[in-house]
Amino acid sequence: MYEHLPHAEGTVKQLQWIHHYLFQDVYDWAGQIRTIDMTKGGGEPFHPLEYMGVGIRYCEQTLKNDNLLQGLSIDEFISKLSVNYNNFNVLHPFREGNGRTQRVFWDMVARDAGYHFDWGLITQRVNDKASIQAKDTNDTKLLEDMFRIITKPLQVDLLAQQQFAHLVEEEYEYAPNVASVLQDKDYAAYKTRYGID
């Protein structure tokens, strides 16, 4: 797949295409937007299904306004990437496989912007911790630190040859593919907490 990646569009439709490609032999619903509200690892819930359309438009428009991260210095790229990466992570459009799908998606965005990621330089634990902190607190500092380690200009060779090497190095911080479906009472509590009508 990596040899023939199309140009980045920065859209959820492209995320759906990637997800379908990766998981078509695993899930009947590969490439389809989730139909349930979810949380993972006991943290804050992902974007509410009820407002998925708004979330999709926000993620796509923010990335588009940032010109798909093109024409930026490496520091600007990392800063804007961290915000956009967190936006799409919070959106969490699929029941499973969001992380792997996002890696391909962001690899495309990075390549078109003149960069690539050496994912094998970090562990799954680093990725989990940075993603969880950003999702739960909207603080992207750990994501920025992570991307500072793995972001390289295209002309610099990658050290780690396996794109997904960090997925198998050690235990997950939270069990993979384990998510909680929000019950009505949980969803009502979050709606009250965040003032959602």
Regions found by a protein language model. Give the residues of each.
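FIC/Doc superfamily catalytic core
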Residues: 1-96, 100-197
